[in-house]
């Protein structure tokens, strides 16, 4: 008997009817459901990233956090931080388009590390997200992926917390300070 493959919308509709524990984030990665707990250190870094974007681009910067966005290959993510183009508009279904994303940052947790470094990185490269930043509070490092081509990132920079990350060459007029990122 053939199984019926559900669309992302159908999967998310089913998730909305399920009792998801409070404080958990739910995403669909390559058609599989992942739940991960939100932690205070995780949120503290996200807040610092959003503030850095607001400080540089103003309070009206088009930035989202934990908002569902659909990506190629049955991936429905809620990036920790996503900066969209100033002229980005929602599609006919009322959703933001991944084609308008200029920058994504994911702060890993123990439960999301494999996904953030693997399938999510691959999906973001396939979607040609220009800048993908992985912040790892467990080892105190940031991984910057840029130059997406043919489904892969062709540039990778690793820096320790405390090192500034200049995103200008990657197309975003921002130098990100990491010296106050907390470690877990």
Which role fits each region the language model picked out?
Residues 1-127, 131-184:
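Gly/Pro/Ser/Thr-rich low-complexity, intrinsically disordered segments predominantly at protein N-termini
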């Amino acid at each position: 008997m053939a199984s019926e493959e559900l669309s992302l919308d159908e999967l998310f509709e089913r998730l909305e009817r399920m009792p998801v524990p409070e404080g958990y984030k739910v995403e669909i990665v390559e058609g599989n459901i992942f739940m991960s707990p939100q932690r205070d250190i995780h949120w503290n870094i996200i807040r610092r990233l959003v503030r850095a974007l607001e400080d540089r681009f103003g309070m009206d910067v088009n930035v989202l956090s934990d908002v569902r966005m659909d990506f190629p290959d049955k991936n429905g993510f809620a990036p920790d931080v996503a900066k969209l183009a100033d002229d980005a508009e929602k599609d006919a279904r009322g959703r933001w388009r991944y084609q308008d994303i200029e920058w994504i940052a994911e702060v890993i947790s123990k439960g999301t590390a494999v996904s953030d470094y693997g399938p999510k990185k691959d999906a973001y490269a396939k979607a040609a997200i220009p800048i993908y930043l992985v912040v790892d509070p467990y080892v105190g490092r940031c991984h910057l992926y840029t130059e997406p081509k043919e489904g892969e990132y062709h540039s990778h920079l690793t820096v320790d917390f405390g090192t500034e990350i200049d995103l200008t060459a990657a197309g975003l007029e921002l130098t990100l300070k990491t010296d106050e990122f907390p470690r877990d």
